[in-house]
Structures are given as C-alpha cells and as structure tokens.
C-alpha cells in the first residue's frame, strides 16, 4: 500500500513526462492482479491521479491511464467501486460523460479503450439505471453513440468501436434500456440490426445478438418484432440460415431477404451465439399469435434445415436442444397446444428437473 501511495506524487499533471510515464506503467501492471487493484482502489488520491492522466497531452500516458481503468472495471465489484468513487472524490470525475464524449468524438484516438471502460461499467446491472440517466441528460448523446456504432468509418483515428455493441446490450438488461432501444425517437434497434451477421468481429456481432435476445425476452416488444416489417425477424434468422434450397412453395413463405440464398451462405460459427438466436425464437413462441406468424414466415422450414446441419456439422448439444424446443412448438397445431400463452403455465420443480434430464439424454442420443 505504501509503495502504491508513493507513486501518486509522480502522477500529477504538472510532473515531468518521464516520471509520469514510468509511474503509470507500474500502476498499469498492478491493475493486472486482484491485489494490485485492491491497493489502488483503497486510495482515492491514486484513482484521482489516474482519472486526471486520462486527459494528459501525451498520448501514451493518456492511453495507459484509460487502460488502467479498463482493468480496474473488469469485474463487477471493482467496476461498482470505480463508479461510486468517481462521484465521491473532489472534484468528481464524470466517468460516464467522459467515456461517451470520447467515443462519439470522431477525432478521438482513445475511443476504443473508453468504449471498453463504459462496456465494463454498464455490465453491472445495478448501475444501468443511473448510467441511463446520465446518457439521457444530453439530448444527442445516445443518437451520437448509435451513429458511431452504425457507421464503420466513423472514427477518423481508426478506432473500430466494436464495444459499443456490448454497451447497448448491457443497457437492454433493464426495461428502460429496452424501451430506449426500441423507441422510434432514437431508432437504435434499426441501426444495430445489420450487425447480427457481421462476420468481421465477434464482439460487435455478439453484442448485437445479445440486444436481440434481451428485447425478445420482453413480451412487450413481440408485436414490434413480428410486425409488418420483417427486419428484426430476418436479423434473428439470417445467421441460422445456410445455402440449402427450398421448394418454391417454401420460399414464398420466407421473408424476401432469406429467399434463394447463395451457395456461399454460411451459418453463425459461434455456438453460444447460435443458442442465443434460438432462444430468441423460443421466446417469440410464447403466444398463439406469435406462433402463427412464425409458422407463416417459414421459421419451421429454416429450423428443419438448421437442425440437420447442427447434428452433422455444428455438433453443439445445447444448440440442438434449443432448436428442438422451438421446433416442438411450431410443429404442433394450435388445437394440440391448447394455450394462448406458454408463460402462464406453472411447471412444478420436480417435473422441470425431469424434463431437463430427458432433454440431455435425447440430445446425447442424437450426437452419439
């Protein structure tokens, strides 16, 4: 602790550059261990010094300061401490505002590391409401962040801003975040949808799919998802589609974007993301109206071919089970189901455990 506290004097804005750089390099190394993070977070002066150096005129010093914040916010407990310490110190450090400003600044060379800091902070669900309060104070903050995400060449310093996807995903953990994402005022969801199939980066793609999952798990938005515009449903289905040919009759059922896909069409390579997409579809199967729309849009036909591929190529048991769960519902007639809303059904705990075990044994038999 004493060694750490001695570094603070060398991390002041008016200190010699070489001393700042060496001291900060040492601090950055300390943030790589739990003990080092604990020592730093126990000293308000040290955290204040790190905050201050994020604005340093020297790019390397400023970058190392932000990288230190990334490490300090890497787990939920430490992220919560950093967030509250930033408010408590004098003068307070507006960490969310600074991050949002840097990310939306086209000329910021530190937009990427700042996006990782904000991603870490928004991952803590207990902080999300307060972070949303801050982001909404500026009328243009959320629209600018959405623009920065949607426009791949937005940052002129070659920052890729992929971590905006998990930021938006984290914000949709809560109902208010989902409302903002789906609100016509911001058109956030519309801007994010194309990146559910973005092959170049799994962080951007995974964050976008996470947003879709969070929205699908909220029945309030099922009407929006399955409205006249097929964009959201297409974003969910496209990564599950392959190059298989359908009959003309089956093709006519599919959304136009999913008809006659080329032979080069590939499926999502990450099994965790495939499972999330299938979980989206399962949530959409909750009501009779939604099930009827999914059947009419050819979702069963798409999953029929997907299931063959997963059993032969993908070979992921969780994905096979997730697919089976959706197919089992869509293949039935509504008269057989006899329910308007599956979510109104209460399943006893012992029966639920039995279903889980049966599912495990069934999927195992498919892959053995």
Swiss-Prot record:
SUPFAM superfamilies linked to this entry: ARM repeat (SSF48371)
Disulphides: none
Domain of life: Eukaryota
Alphabetical list of InterPro entries matching this protein: ARM-like, ARM-type_fold, Hgh1, Protein_HGH1_C, Protein_HGH1_N
Signal peptide: none
Similarity comment: Belongs to the HGH1 family.
Protein name, as recorded: Protein HGH1 homolog
Organism: Drosophila pseudoobscura pseudoobscura
Organismal lineage: Eukaryota, Metazoa, Ecdysozoa, Arthropoda, Hexapoda
């Amino acid at each position: 602790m004493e060694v750490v506290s001695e570094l603070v004097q060398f991390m002041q804005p008016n200190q010699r550059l070489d001393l700042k750089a060496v001291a900060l390099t040492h601090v950055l190394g300390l943030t790589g261990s739990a003990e080092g993070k604990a020592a730093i977070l126990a000293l308000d002066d040290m955290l204040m010094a790190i905050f201050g150096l994020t604005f340093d005129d020297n790019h390397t010093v400023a970058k190392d300061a932000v990288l230190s914040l990334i490490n300090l916010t890497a787990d939920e407990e430490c992220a919560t401490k950093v967030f509250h310490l930033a408010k408590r110190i004098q003068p307070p450090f507006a960490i969310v505002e600074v991050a949002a400003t840097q990310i939306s600044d086209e000329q910021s060379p530190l937009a990427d590391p700042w996006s990782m800091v904000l991603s870490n902070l928004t991952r803590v669900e207990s902080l999300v409401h307060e972070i949303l309060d801050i982001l909404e104070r500026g009328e243009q903050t959320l629209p600018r962040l959405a623009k920065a995400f949607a426009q791949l060449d937005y940052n002129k310093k070659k920052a890729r801003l992929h971590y905006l996807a998990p930021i938006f995903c984290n914000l949709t953990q809560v109902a208010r975040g989902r409302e903002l994402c789906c609100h016509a005022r911001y058109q956030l969801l519309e801007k994010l949808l194309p990146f559910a199939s973005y092959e170049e980066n799994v962080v951007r793609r995974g964050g976008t799919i996470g947003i879709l999952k969070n929205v699908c798990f909220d029945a309030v938005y099922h009407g929006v998802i399955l409205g006249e515009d097929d964009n959201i449903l297409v974003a969910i289905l496209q990564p599950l589609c392959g190059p298989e040919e359908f009959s003309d009759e089956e093709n006519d059922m599919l959304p136009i974007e999913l008809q006659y896909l080329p032979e080069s069409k590939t499926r999502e390579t990450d099994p965790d993301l495939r499972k999330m997409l299938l979980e989206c579809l399962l949530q959409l199967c909750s009501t009779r109206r939604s099930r009827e729309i999914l059947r009419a849009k050819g979702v069963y036909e798409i999953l029929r071919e997907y299931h063959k591929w997963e059993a032969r190529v993908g070979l992921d048991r969780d994905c096979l089970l997730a697919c089976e769960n959706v197919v089992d519902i869509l293949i039935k007639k509504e008269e057989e189901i006899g329910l308007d809303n599956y979510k109104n059904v209460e399943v006893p705990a012992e029966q639920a455990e039995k279903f889980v075990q049966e599912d495990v044994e069934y999927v195992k038999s498919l892959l053995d």
